[in-house]
Design a protein with these regions (language model features):
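Outer-membrane beta-barrel translocator/receptor signature
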Residues: 67-69, 78-124, 128-135, 146
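Periplasmic polypeptide-binding modules associated with outer-membrane biogenesis and secretion
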Residues: 1-74, 107-112, 139, 294-298, ...
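Extracellular loop and loop/strand-boundary signature of outer-membrane beta-barrel proteins
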Residues: 155-156, 206-212, 281-287, 359-363, ...
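Transmembrane beta-barrel outer-membrane domains
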Residues: 20, 33, 49-51, 79-83, ...
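Transmembrane beta-strand segments of outer-membrane beta-barrel domains in Gram-negative
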Residues: 67, 115-127, 131-317
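Outer-membrane beta-barrel "beta-signal"
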Residues: 430-435, 460-474
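Extracytoplasmic gating/loop element in the C-terminal half of outer-membrane beta-barrel translocons
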Residues: 54, 311-390, 394-404
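Outer-membrane beta-barrel pore domains and translocons
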Residues: 12, 43-45, 61, 73-77, ...
Length: 474
């Protein structure tokens, strides 16, 4: 596809020589992953009248179009905690002779606490924006334009439940001149089927079961904006904004198109708290509730380089998910958690209670609001071995709970500061060149769920939380 190839070359007749234009062209051609060698050669026209004109010849050497990879690694998925995961991928980088990338991935994970996840993912990427309107012309100052189709089938098995999900999405991705990366997901359709193990679900609070564990259809659209000015020699920063909406279009069509309503065993409609009906949609001959919510998050990170061996990393993140209309509660896997290897490292993932709610070791905690701030001092030890000292502060909350027993989980402005949880700790990082193996030991110093919140006198290794992960936490 010569037109698609030409769109990756930003050199134009008559423009002044500019090295950045050639660098941008080289980067765009490399992004296609179709060439093992790319080179530019320049020559000057041998003419007195055109002595200031350069001719650029571009040489492209075709590379392998098919690649495969097999990976085995330690997983830090917050739902799986620590465990072993593996994947096998097969890729074709020119499947339709237009630098289209097709990737098929099979993956599986096995947690040390009897939690398994297996699935398959298909990604089909076109290196341009495919649309009825000429988006390429509107965004002619952008690079790395992509249209992405994704489909997946995932099964998660926990002692408490089995969750099967099937999803498909259609997205655009592009980067502007200012290095802002945009991702617009026009639609992402997911069907989640939940089957509970009654014996184990008895160990989980009724509040959590009623809120989160149900089969449902999730239609979403989302937009993500991110920016990173990564620089190993200077201070750098990272910014990410995400907003996601689910179900509003279906809800607006439910009444005009006479969607079915959720009913009880007596055939009476089950109404929302405001008296509105709950509509369902037929998925594979089964009536399922479709979700309706809005979710947004903001993540900012700053990396202060003190010198070659010492640096300070700061992260602050705030998120909100609010269910309305057709559903009172947000899907379990869309909500926020606290604890684990990447934020409040003094707690296990899912084990940090929302707000000042009392801890229950048999409950998996989630929240509709999250705020976390972490500061980490990073320093070199010996060769590839590095160390860190950190402090994490934050929590998760529910937006509202009608159950008085869980009132302490609700977010209240006048209790926000008092319900901030704090941990401190230290860790080691070993650089294996291709990845970084990380271990952290976290100690809870402030627990808002306890009457005596400060835990300085209880700091010891018996009360610590060990975390292992790949890469830096942020």
């Amino acid at each position: 596809n010569l037109n698609r190839l030409a769109n990756k070359i930003f050199i134009r007749p008559g423009i002044p020589y500019n090295k950045s234009v050639f660098d941008k062209s080289y980067e765009a051609l490399s992004e296609l992953k179709n060439f093992k060698k790319i080179s530019f050669e320049f020559s000057q026209i041998d003419s007195d009248s055109n002595k200031d004109i350069l001719v650029s010849d571009i040489f492209l050497t075709s590379g392998n179009k098919i690649a495969y990879s097999v990976e085995l690694e330690a997983t830090t998925n917050p739902e799986l905690k620590e465990g072993i995961s593996g994947s096998a991928s097969l890729s074709h980088y020119n499947i339709l002779n237009g630098a289209e990338h097709l990737q098929l991935t099979f993956k599986g994970s096995n947690n040390f606490r009897n939690i398994k996840e297996n699935g398959a993912v298909i990604n089909f990427t076109i290196p341009s924006l495919i649309s009825p309107i000429q988006l390429n012309q509107i965004l002619n100052k952008t690079s790395k334009q992509k249209t992405i189709f994704t489909a997946s089938v995932i099964e998660m098995q926990r002692p408490e439940f089995t969750r099967n999900s099937i999803s498909g999405s259609f997205s655009y991705q592009w980067i502007t001149r200012q290095k802002f990366q945009h991702k617009l997901s026009l639609f992402n359709l997911s069907y989640v089927n939940f089957e509970g193990n009654t014996a184990d679900l008895n160990n989980i609070s009724e509040y959590l079961i009623a809120k989160d564990y149900s089969s449902h259809f999730i239609p979403t659209s989302s937009y993500t904006l991110s920016y990173e000015n990564k620089n190993k020699l200077k201070n750098s920063s990272f910014f990410r904004f995400h907003i996601e909406s689910s179900g509003s279009l279906l809800r607006s069509l439910a009444s005009p198109l006479n969607f079915n309503q959720l009913k009880n065993e007596e055939g009476e409609p089950i109404l929302q708290e405001d008296g509105a009906p709950t509509y369902t949609i037929n998925v594979w001959n089964s009536e399922n509730i479709f979700t309706q919510y809005i979710k947004t998050s903001l993540d900012y990170r700053y990396y202060w380089k003190i010198n070659q061996k010492n640096s300070i990393a700061v992260r602050t993140m705030t998120g909100l998910i609010y269910a309305f209309g057709n559903t009172n509660q947000s899907p379990f896997h869309k909500k926020f958690i606290a604890g684990g290897a990447n934020d409040l490292r003094g707690w296990q993932a899912f084990k940090k209670p929302a707000g000042s709610l009392q801890n229950n070791i048999d409950t998996l905690f989630t929240g509709g609001i999250k705020h976390i701030t972490s500061i980490e001092y990073r320093f070199n030890l010996i060769k590839k071995l590095k160390g860190s000292a950190f402090i994490d502060a934050g929590n998760i909350w529910e937006i509202s709970s009608n159950n008085d027993e869980y009132e302490e989980a609700n977010f209240k402005w006048d209790q926000f500061i008092d319900e901030i949880a704090v941990d401190i700790g230290f860790g080691l990082r070993y650089d294996f060149k291709y990845f970084i193996l990380r271990t952290d030991l976290g100690f809870v110093v402030r627990d808002p769920s306890e009457s005596d919140k400060w835990k300085w006198r209880e700091l010891n290794f018996n009360n610590s939380q060990f975390n292992i992960g790949l890469g830096y936490p942020f």
